[in-house]
Design a protein with these regions (language model features):
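Conserved Class I SAM-dependent methyltransferase catalytic core
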Residues: 232-294
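Residue-level signal for inorganic ion chemistry
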Residues: 35, 78, 108, 140, ...
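General small-molecule cofactor/ligand-binding pocket signal
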Residues: 96, 180-182, 280-282
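Generic C-terminal helix-cap and adjacent flexible tail
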Residues: 120, 277, 295-299
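Conserved AdoMet
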Residues: 37-117
Length: 299
């Protein structure tokens, strides 16, 4: 969304009446309130307080007309709100996102926590070098670099559009001095560092091709299929990432993956077939097996 001059103040009752009218036409209240916060600058607690003070003046970052246009594009054309406002809150970051770049999901935040835990259990003689395969918006790479300042990282994506967005986000958060952004497919751009990577994490596409047609239109029509389509069984990219780990990881290095909640057994089998030790599943916030880890055997 382009920057706009602050709108003229309105009363709390005018805003609440506008909100009621829009929701009467359809849509989720939580999503409209998210738009009010991200585009209008009005947080949930402030919105709640307005109910008690109907005559209070309210200053928004943009006009109700502008908010209405964005909401209609979301409700009628199913455009993701994150694309419409150009940002996505994720972990402790506010990442810029745009069409062509996958919108970071909250579940993926746990992959950073798993990576930080794994970092504490790495062999002491390993260089603190990590890689993010399929970086997209750069969410994982930026969060890990910010939380692990002693480390350096390599972030890979085959989409030039995604890589440009990730690099811009890295610049915003001041971590580009410790991340190299590399174009290419999975392990291929990392060849100069094969055998040196202490930690590799990846949230690759894992949705079976046949299931893409059944996704919510917000996802199906607007987010990049390149970041969603995992092939006929959903495991195509996961296989490539796991199979490369035996060469790419340093001895004792860790691989961390996100996958679909019904793929845990298959991913465990892939880790074992690749010769990785200590294959483990990990649960998401809903208690589903959504992540996996394995370690390259130490020499």
């Amino acid at each position: 969304m382009q920057e706009q001059a602050p709108a003229q103040p309105i009363t709390a009752e005018e805003l609440l009446s506008w909100r009621r009218q829009l929701l009467a036409q359809g849509g989720e209240p939580g999503q409209l309130d998210w738009l009010l916060e991200m585009a209008g600058g009005l947080g949930w607690q402030e919105l709640q307080a307005l109910r008690l003070h109907p005559s209070r003046p309210v200053e928004l970052h943009c006009s109700l007309h502008q908010l209405h246009r964005l909401w209609q594009r979301h409700r009628l054309q199913h455009e993701p709100l994150q694309y419409l406002v150009g940002c996505c809150p994720w972990r402790d970051l506010r990442l810029a996102v745009a069409p062509g770049v996958l919108i970071p999901r909250q579940d993926t935040e746990l992959l950073v926590e798993l990576a930080l835990e794994a970092a504490m259990d790495l062999p002491q003689d390993l260089e603190l070098l990590w890689a993010d395969l399929g970086t997209g918006s750069g969410c994982l790479a930026i969060a890990l670099a910010a939380a692990w300042p002693a480390s350096t990282g390599l972030a890979v994506d085959c989409s030039a559009e995604a890589l440009a967005q990730a690099s811009a986000n890295g610049q915003t958060f001041g971590v580009n001095g410790r991340i190299q952004w590399l174009g290419g497919h999975w392990w291929q751009p990392l060849r100069p560092w094969w055998g040196q990577l202490a930690l590799v994490l990846s949230n690759p596409p894992y949705i079976p091709t046949a299931e893409l047609a059944h996704l919510d239109p917000v996802v199906r029509w607007h987010e990049p299929s390149l970041a969603l389509d995992g092939g006929s069984d959903g495991l195509g990219a996961l296989r490539l990432v796991v199979e490369g780990a035996a060469l790419g990881l340093a001895p004792g290095g860790m691989l961390l993956l996100e996958h679909h909640h019904d793929q845990s057994s298959a991913v465990m089998a892939l880790l074992e077939a690749a010769g990785l030790e200590q294959p483990r599943p990990h649960r998401d916030l809903e208690g589903r097996w959504r992540f996996a880890s394995g370690r390259r055997r130490q020499s």
